[in-house]
């Protein structure tokens, strides 16, 4: 056939015309344009946090999920998810409408208001990639020794908290509700344990379990977080002979209050350093069924520990506890005075404030996703966003010579929300981005938390809740009491 004639005398049998690249369809061209404009709409977040989250973590995969050119590729999906976390509403619909509004403003109306494509793209994000990004945000803090709380050593403060999530069969199977609640009347509950850097507030690692999970087993899964020279700081729930030994092997010292043991006296101590400051010994407890080691391995633990016991007297009004004992492996009274150790434990309360920033300010207390797989990704994104904001706070503090723990996390989040749109408009100008970044640091540095040591406020609600009935049976079986505002329960 004449039209199949070879046009190249140098390559006999080869049809040059058939090797031409297939022209792209109008739909493919429009998809590329939409993806490019969506990426530009998220450049504000990238300009703020791109130096904390390297681009190579967000490149499309070679094969498998997020390997094809889509509107929501890997990088776009990540930054859209990030934007969803820091938004005041935090819903999928809000972030999609934000992107659609930007495209409409640019005269490009090809993005649907449906959240289906975005939710499918979120599901394709690999949990291992998010874990690597979180570890990078935690390890990239450059902290001076002068900023460390005690003798230039990093202090890792640990505590646990609870979270709830949508009532779906999958979530209930993974994190069941408490047994005292009727089926259909409660929500899945999760136990979360976090390890935080006391100097920066950054989350170093985390562990999750059901509400029945004790915090000690969750901590033991995170022992690799601790490095030689660190100091472990915890509450009385972490007072454990076994864990002291595991930390000692890693070159990590421990500070926690005494629990489940009778304090030593001057008559039974090894040495008295000062009043209420004693060098003591602990005997290895007898093996028990729920011990973390088999009996043979348990008996190989040291029979005696040499520790330090410090009695702390609380003479400030408003505190329930009047005195307590601190146990520590920091034995040198010259390098670690008793007063410094007591003040370090006093700062342990900061971990409660870190969780408040996550749960109340960033609204992580009630998770949104409906499957365990997405719940874990949602948690990781919350932690990544939290660490990234902590980076901004730490930079602002050093730029303006302020204490990073005195700068407001909520103030930083508010400043970031307002500045995000201006970063988007300045995305093409590096000079303008630097100017906006300086302005953002200035804004964050002005949000200083007042110094209120020893403040005591009861955890009570002043605003009364509405007079709605409590759900005491599944909703489809529940009947509403008429005139509930006038209803009074009869005495038994």
Where are these regions (language model features)?
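Single, function-defining residue in the core of a domain
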Residues: 2-96, 124-125, 132-133, 137, ...
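DNA-recognition alpha helix
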Residues: 91-109
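Major-groove recognition helix of helix-turn-helix-like DNA-binding domains
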Residues: 108-127
């Amino acid at each position: 056939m004449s039209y199949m004639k070879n046009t190249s005398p140098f390559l006999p049998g080869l049809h040059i015309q058939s090797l031409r690249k297939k022209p792209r369809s109008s739909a493919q061209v429009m998809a590329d344009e939409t993806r490019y404009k969506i990426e530009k709409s998220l450049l504000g977040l990238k300009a703020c946090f791109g130096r904390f989250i390297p681009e190579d973590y967000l490149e499309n995969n070679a094969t498998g999920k997020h390997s094809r050119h889509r509107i929501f590729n890997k990088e776009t999906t990540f930054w859209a998810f990030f934007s969803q976390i820091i938004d005041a509403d935090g819903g999928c619909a809000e972030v999609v409408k934000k992107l659609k509004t930007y495209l409409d403003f640019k005269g490009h109306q090809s993005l649907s208001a449906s959240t289906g494509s975005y939710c499918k793209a979120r599901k394709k994000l690999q949990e291992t990639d998010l874990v690597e990004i979180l570890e990078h945000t935690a390890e990239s803090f450059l902290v001076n020794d002068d900023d460390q709380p005690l003798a230039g050593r990093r202090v890792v403060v640990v505590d646990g908290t609870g979270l709830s999530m949508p009532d779906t069969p999958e979530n209930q199977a993974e994190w069941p509700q408490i047994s005292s609640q009727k089926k259909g009347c409660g929500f899945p509950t999760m136990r979360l344990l976090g390890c935080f850097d006391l100097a920066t507030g950054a989350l170093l690692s985390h562990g999750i379990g059901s509400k029945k999970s004790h915090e000690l087993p969750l901590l033991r899964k995170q022992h690799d977080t601790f490095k030689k020279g660190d100091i472990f700081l915890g509450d009385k729930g972490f007072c454990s002979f076994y864990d002291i030994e595991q930390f000692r092997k890693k070159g990590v010292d421990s500070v926690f209050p005494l629990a489940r043991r009778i304090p030593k006296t001057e008559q039974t101590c090894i040495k008295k350093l000062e009043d209420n400051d004693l060098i003591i010994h602990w005997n290895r407890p007898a093996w028990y069924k729920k011990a973390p080691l088999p009996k043979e391995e348990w008996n190989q633990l040291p029979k005696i520990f040499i520790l330090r016991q410090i009695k702390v007297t609380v003479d400030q009004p408003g505190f329930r506890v009047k005195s307590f004992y601190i146990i520590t492996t920091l034995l040198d009274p010259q390098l670690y005075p008793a007063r410094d150790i007591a003040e370090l434990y006093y700062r342990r309360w900061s971990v409660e404030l870190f969780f408040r920033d996550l749960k109340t300010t960033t609204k992580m207390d009630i998770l949104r996703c409906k499957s365990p797989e997405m719940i874990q990704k949602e948690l990781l994104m919350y932690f990544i966003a939290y660490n990234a904001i902590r980076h901004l706070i730490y930079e602002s503090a050093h730029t303006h010579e302020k204490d990073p723990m005195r700068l407001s996390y909520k103030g930083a989040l508010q400043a970031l929300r307002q500045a995000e749109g201006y970063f988007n408009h300045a995305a093409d100008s590096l000079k303008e981005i630097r100017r906006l970044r300086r302005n953002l640091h200035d804004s964050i540095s002005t949000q200083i938390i007042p110094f209120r040591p020893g403040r005591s406020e009861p955890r009570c609600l002043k605003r009364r809740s509405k007079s709605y009935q409590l759900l005491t049976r599944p909703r489809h079986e529940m009947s509403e009491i008429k005139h509930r505002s006038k209803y009074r329960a009869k005495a038994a």
